[in-house]
């Protein structure tokens, strides 16, 4: 999924900016026990193997942060193997230190170099809840071109929520003490939703315009939740496309978190929730343009992406007479070019 998104992010950001940064805050050793590439190596290879690499004129910096010495050393060895293959405008650096303090220092250096507008993609995939304070995430989101991808370890949080020594970590994680209200909720699903909604709202308060949220399961076991914060409508849509392209894979499956929008399976997808969401949004508003519908679906108000609008939703809706189309705004039946006007019934 990370590779899918970066395949779009690198050429878009790398063509229009002087410098771009990929920051992995909990980079790990660079590979898993089975030999599979970890996120920092995936990121570097996604650039090296990109068919549009020549379009990326920006200076690209990979900043890979790992707190544990042995993991950082192993990662550095893997990065050194790839370094000779990197183009002259790219550099990868491994930093053996803690995420929160190091990211603050990196952003301070960026700002001091008059590169405050340099886009950043910051990946935060911790084990646990410490070292990921909301104020640091907010520092990233102050830049309108920057994005954060956070793995939210709900099961870890749920396990230690009543452990006094973790309270200060949770205060910093959420950037508020309101999380304590969730401790009184007995129902597990309601409690989980409370924490999810709080974290999503805190990301918005920290500066994110859109927050994409999905859960990843292994079988029936929740592994973690993903929160992607961005200022870009296109980025929001691209992330959802990336998630759908890899869902499901092996024993893993993604689930959307909007009401009724749960199973993300490309081979057996249910687009009923998308149809219902569009109807709920636009019914009673008279004629709306295809552009308005596209903007709604691209946003974080649905778990779907814009490539699914026409053939998967509008065509069956038109066949079922759930929408009316102004025929003067198109030339062919069951087609919805720019400027098409629709009325939802």
Q: Model segments located where?
A:
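Short, Lys/Arg-rich nucleic-acid/phosphate-binding segment
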Residues: 327-332
């Amino acid at each position: 999924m990370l590779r899918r998104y970066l395949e779009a992010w690198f050429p878009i950001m790398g063509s229009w900016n002087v410098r771009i940064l990929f920051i992995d805050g909990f980079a790990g050793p660079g590979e898993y026990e089975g030999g599979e590439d970890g996120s920092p190596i995936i990121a570097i290879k996604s650039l090296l193997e990109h068919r549009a690499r020549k379009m990326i004129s920006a200076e690209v910096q990979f900043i890979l942060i790992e707190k544990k010495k042995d993991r950082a050393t192993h990662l550095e060895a893997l990065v050194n193997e790839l370094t000779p293959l990197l183009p002259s405008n790219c550099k990868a650096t491994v930093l053996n230190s803690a995420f929160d303090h190091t990211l603050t220092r990196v952003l301070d250096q960026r700002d001091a170099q008059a590169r405050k507008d340099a886009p950043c993609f910051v990946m935060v995939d911790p084990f646990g809840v410490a070292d990921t304070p909301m104020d640091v995430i907010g520092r990233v989101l102050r830049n309108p071109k920057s994005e954060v991808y956070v793995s939210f370890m709900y099961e870890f949080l749920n396990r230690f929520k009543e452990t006094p020594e973790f309270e200060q970590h949770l205060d910093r994680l959420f950037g508020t003490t309101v999380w304590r209200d969730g401790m009184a909720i007995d129902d597990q699903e309601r409690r989980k939703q409370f924490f999810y909604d709080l974290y999503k709202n805190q990301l918005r308060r920290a500066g994110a315009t859109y927050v994409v949220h999905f859960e990843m399961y292994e079988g029936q076991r929740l592994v973690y939740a993903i929160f992607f914060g961005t200022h870009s409508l296109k980025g929001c849509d691209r992330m959802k496309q990336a998630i759908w392209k890899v869902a499901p894979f092996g024993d893993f499956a993604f689930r959307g978190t909007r009401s009724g929008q749960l199973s993300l399976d490309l081979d057996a997808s249910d687009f009923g929730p998308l149809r219902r969401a569009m109807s709920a949004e636009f019914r009673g508003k008279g004629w709306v343009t295809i552009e308005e519908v596209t903007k709604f679906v691209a946003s974080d108000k649905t778990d779907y992406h814009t490539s699914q609008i026409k053939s998967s939703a509008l065509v069956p809706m038109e066949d079922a007479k759930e929408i009316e189309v102004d025929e003067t705004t198109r030339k062919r039946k069951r087609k919805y070019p720019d400027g098409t006007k629709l009325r939802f019934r």
